[in-house]
């Protein structure tokens, strides 16, 4: 019955193989139309994608509708019939996922979404990455530094068998490493006059990410147990503090990396190096990078993003208001999202109170990433270099007195930073140069 109905839907669409024959089609025209209609506010469904060989003129004019895709996608996974999309007759662009149905696959930490939805996600990732990051080293060459191998990723056709490889999804995804985070050399103590979380004003930035909604997102998106979600929702969990290693952090990182394929960064330096300002900056950048890698994978998932935002109204408002500042979030509803992925790094610095201007990247003869020249800047004397945060991550605005002649230039690393950057276990993959056009 399911296959008969699906075959009728695809009768005039024979240029692409049916989804049960190919788990990753090269191109699906109707799926792009459905995504655009669903996440761009078109309440009338998708644009017509076929209008020939139909007996009914109304059907030809109407085309493939959003409700058709809902029904069709759940035929491949009937057990998820009421998860994620709500009523098929609902006119709203999307509906939130009931929380009691989010945590139904706790043993394998797998989101409860249909196979068809995962196909769309993985197809979009594979299709867009080659144009965007030609200089990035492949994930294959650095698998020895990853605690989670691609072979442990869940398979599309065998969701219960987590040992099946999913190489077509994992081998094409590129992530930043610690060496690629723009360094911000600042003298003295970083003052947090307007902080977002638990930290006290004037405290050194030591790797905490106090914004609790970041962890709520990861819990909702990656099926962590409800008990873990409740703990994280109550307070900001320390991430990167060398003296605190909560099991929640390890569970979070392990679960998200297993599903998304994000490589886990290597271990921290030995205990004799875990002291001083330079180590704090290293630890902060390292863990900030880990979270940004995971979050970019979550935000890039068209099917998860709107539903999570409805479950977190505060973050929904903040992300909506940050759109003019962050081109990535403004284009997250579109298929080609990775062209602005570099804006994630400064954005998550702002979440963690790591005040810095939005960086500009350009190609250099040295083949290295750009860094800020902050040798003449101090926080206390040059407040105009710092974005003014007025109400949260979504309200960040650069001061109008930001100097027009401010240009990024290369800053040499200290001996301690060079020692960290030369350690092979500090990053999962390296980028020789970054030159996107913002």
From Swiss-Prot:
The keyword Ribosomal protein does not apply. It is found in: Virion. GO terms for cellular component: virion component. The keyword Glycoprotein does not apply. Keywords: Late protein, Virion. Induction: Expressed in the late phase of the viral replicative cycle. Coiled coil: none annotated. Belongs to the asfivirus p49 structural protein family. Together with the penton and the other minor capsid proteins (M1249L, p17), forms a complicated network immediately below the outer capsid shell, stabilizing the whole capsid. Plays an essential role in the formation of infectious virus particles. Especially required for the formation of the capsid vertices. During virion assembly, associates with the membrane and probably mediates the docking of the penton complex to the inner membrane, where it recruits the capsomers to form the penton core. This is Minor capsid protein p49. It comes from African swine fever virus (isolate Pig/Kenya/KEN-50/1950).
């Amino acid at each position: 019955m399911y296959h008969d109905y699906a075959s009728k839907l695809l009768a005039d669409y024979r240029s692409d193989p049916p989804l049960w024959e190919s788990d990753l089609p090269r191109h699906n025209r109707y799926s792009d139309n459905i995504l655009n209609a669903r996440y761009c506010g078109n309440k009338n469904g998708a644009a017509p994608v076929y209008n020939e060989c139909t007996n009914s003129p109304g059907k030809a004019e109407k085309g493939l509708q959003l409700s058709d895709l809902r029904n069709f996608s759940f035929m491949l996974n009937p057990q998820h019939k009421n998860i994620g999309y709500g009523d098929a007759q609902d006119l709203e662009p999307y509906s939130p996922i009931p929380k009691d149905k989010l945590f139904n696959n706790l043993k394998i930490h797998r989101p409860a979404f249909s196979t068809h939805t995962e196909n769309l996600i993985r197809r979009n990732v594979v299709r867009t990455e080659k144009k965007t990051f030609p200089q990035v080293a492949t994930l294959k060459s650095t698998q020895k530094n990853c605690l989670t191998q691609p072979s442990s990723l869940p398979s599309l056709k065998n969701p219960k068998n987590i040992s099946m490889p999913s190489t077509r999804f994992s081998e094409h995804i590129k992530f930043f490493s610690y060496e690629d985070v723009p360094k911000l050399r600042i003298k003295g103590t970083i003052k947090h006059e307007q902080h977002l979380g638990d930290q006290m004003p004037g405290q050194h930035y030591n790797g905490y990410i106090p914004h609790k909604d970041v962890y709520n997102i990861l819990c909702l998106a990656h099926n962590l147990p409800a008990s873990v979600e409740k703990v994280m929702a109550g307070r900001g969990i320390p991430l990167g503090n060398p003296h605190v290693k909560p099991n929640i952090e390890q569970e979070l990182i392990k679960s998200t990396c297993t599903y998304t394929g994000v490589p886990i960064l290597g271990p921290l330096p030995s205990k004799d190096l875990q002291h001083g300002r330079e180590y704090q900056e290293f630890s902060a950048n390292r863990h900030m990078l880990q979270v940004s890698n995971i979050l970019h994978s979550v935000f890039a998932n068209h099917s998860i993003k709107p539903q999570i935002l409805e479950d977190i109204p505060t973050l929904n408002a903040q992300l909506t208001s940050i759109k003019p500042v962050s081109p990535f979030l403004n284009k997250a509803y579109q298929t080609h999202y990775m062209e602005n992925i570099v804006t994630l790094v400064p954005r998550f610095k702002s979440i963690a109170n790591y005040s810095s201007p939005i960086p500009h990247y350009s190609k250099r003869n040295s083949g290295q990433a750009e860094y800020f020249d902050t040798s003449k800047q101090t926080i206390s004397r040059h407040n105009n270099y710092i974005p003014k945060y007025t109400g949260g991550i979504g309200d960040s605005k650069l001061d109008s007195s930001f100097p027009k002649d401010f240009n990024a230039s290369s800053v040499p690393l200290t001996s301690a930073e060079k020692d960290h950057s030369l350690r092979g276990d500090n990053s999962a993959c390296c980028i020789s140069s970054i030159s996107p056009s913002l």
